[in-house]
Swiss-Prot record:
Compartment(s): Plastid, Chloroplast
InterPro entries in alphabetical order: Domain_X, Maturase_MatK, Maturase_MatK_N
Protein's recorded name: Maturase K
Keywords from the UniProt entry: Chloroplast, mRNA processing, Plastid, RNA-binding, tRNA processing
Gene Ontology molecular function: RNA binding
Task performed by this protein: Usually encoded in the trnK tRNA gene intron. Probably assists in splicing its own and other chloroplast group II introns.
Organism in which the protein naturally occurs: Pinus pumila (Dwarf Siberian pine)
Length: 515
């Protein structure tokens, strides 16, 4: 792989990343085949791999020769298999060639990212979900407006190719990418006739498309936000000298006082903070309502002009934090006023001052979680636990482990929220639903199941003090656990209930705009 990077660097100095000859290198497909085997071995056992999936580099050489002859055999990237006995969708040939295409396209972006990271001191880029919660606690209390924006994930394949063309000047190297995208677009499984760039399938190709697409969206957006933070009077044009900037602001303030006092606040530098998780992004702004409306307008206009996408208005929602709650990522997020009483002593005199601070307050969405539990057949609409009939064919340990995993995911994910008392209602529903599922499996009652299996099985999974076993709490500190927030380190394993609840919230917002 280092040789490909060196080859890309040499071509970058001569012909702006001339990558087309890399497609005919046999070593490239050997590397991609190893990556394909590593990915398949981690997802499925070796005994599931049939003998028909044997890989032959002689066949790859023949395919390379056919590509050189340009007899339209490029369609093998998606749905063609040289071995008729092998499954078309799981063919190692198509996957390996697709991996090779991804490796070639990653060469210029890896070189570009090496030099772009050096200039990212002003905009700190975090790549972990753990950075979201410090961001919310640090930036949300100092913001008064929030914009919840969703990245459009359905895009025309030709737009993706044009965005690649801005970096890769080698036009022939983009022909295989265009063929793959159009082949996927015209496949019978794709009913929307567009490219879904969200990596629903964990393949290297779709992950690369998603990362590149998000990078293009955020890189241009960051430059607009940086320019807009210098001045609101000149759109996206920073002042060359700071002295002229202060003089112009002073002149505008004197002029605006004759008309309206509210226009003075439009000239102050706004504080704009940005965070993204998945396809949802949050822009926290400290400014006026007119500034938030302009940011929302610029964001919609940016997507339409840069990516030629019509972005629905409900994809960018703006509201005030002190009056409304946001619903991302899986929380009810709000900022509340917290009066703080501080006493200071100076010169033997006691001065008492009341300080009012803003406090970030994530709320556990108990009612939506109950609705999702009813949707997944753990309880009815009123919250009464019922048996999970689809799990009755599992063993007792599997049933207990599944219920236990759901509870641990819920508790750990909402461990940093205030008012976690409602979670114990969820715990009661899950424990009783687990007991009813075991009773339904053994065709007995809950009392008989407890006598036969013993209460220790339930205590193993639903113990009262289990959630505090791993926390460094003393006996006195345990009483203050409801007022303290601890974000667990295993929250990246987000439970599917949170994602399902977020989809329901999106549908509600869409219905409001459709009316």
């Amino acid at each position: 792989m280092d040789e490909f990077h060196r080859y890309g660097k040499e071509d970058n100095s001569r012909q702006q990343c001339f990558l087309y000859p890399l497609f005919f290198q046999e070593d490239l497909y050997a590397i991609s085949h190893d990556h394909y085997l590593d990915g398949s071995s981690s997802s499925e056992p070796m005994e599931h791999l049939s003998s028909n999936d044997q890989f032959s580099f002689l066949t790859v050489k023949r395919l390379i020769g056919q590509i050189r002859q340009q007899n339209h055999s490029i369609v093998l990237f998606v749905n063609c298999a040289p071995n008729p006995l092998a499954d078309c969708k799981k063919s190692s040939y198509s996957e390996s060639v697709l991996e090779g295409l991804t490796l070639v396209l990653e060469v210029p972006f890896s070189i570009r990212s090496k030099y772009s990271v050096e200039g990212m001191n002003e905009w700190k880029s975090f790549r972990s979900i753990h950075s979201i919660f410090p961001f919310l606690e640090d930036k949300f209390p100092h913001s008064n407006y929030i914009s919840d924006a969703r990245i459009p994930y359905s895009i025309h394949p030709e737009i993706l190719v044009r965005t690649f063309r801005r970096l890769i000047r080698d036009a022939p190297s983009l022909h295989p990418l265009r063929s793959v995208l159009y082949e996927y677009r015209n496949s019978p499984e794709n009913l929307q006739r567009s490219i879904i760039v969200v990596p629903r399938v964990n393949t290297r190709f779709f992950l690369f498309l998603w990362n590149y697409y998000v990078y293009e969206c955020e890189s241009i957006l960051f430059s607009l936000l940086k320019r807009s933070s210098h001045s609101r009077s000149v759109a996206h044009r920073p002042f060359p000298q700071r002295t002229h900037f202060h003089r112009k602001i002073k002149h505008i303030i004197i002029f605006s006082r004759r008309n309206s006092l509210k226009s003075i606040w439009l000239l102050k530098d706004p504080k704009i903070n940005y965070v993204r998780y998945g396809e949802r992004s949050i822009i926290a702004i400290k400014g006026t309502h007119l500034l938030v409306k302009k940011c929302r307008y610029y964001l919609l206009l940016f997507r339409q002009c840069y990516f030629h996408l019509w972005s629905e208005p409900y994809r960018v929602c703006s509201h005030q934090l002190s009056k409304n709650c946001s619903s991302s990522p899986g929380y009810f997020l709000r900022v509340r006023m917290n009066p703080l009483f501080v006493r200071t002593k100076m010169l033997d005199e006691l001065f008492i001052a009341d300080l009012i601070t803003n406090e970030f307050d994530p709320i556990v969405p108990i009612v939506p979680i109950l609705g999702l539990l009813a949707r997944e057949k753990f309880c009815d609409v009123s919250g009464r636990p019922i048996s999970k009939l689809s799990w009755t064919n599992l063993t007792d340990d599997d049933i207990l482990n599944r219920f236990d995993q759901i509870w641990r995911n819920l508790f750990h994910y909402y461990s940093g929220s205030f008012g976690r008392d409602g979670l114990y209602r969820i715990k009661y529903i899950l424990s009783l639903s687990c007991a009813k599922t075991l009773a339904c499996k053994h065709k007995s009652t809950i009392r008989v199941v407890r006598k036969e299996l013993g209460p220790e099985l339930f205590q193993k999974s639903f113990s009262k003090e289990r959630e505090f076993d791993s926390l460094p709490f003393s006996s006195k500190a345990a009483a203050r656990s409801q007022r303290e927030r601890i974000w667990h380190s295993d929250i990246p394993q987000i439970n599917p209930l949170v994602n399902s609840w977020q989809k329901i919230q999106d549908l509600k917002i869409e219905n409001l705009f459709d009316q």
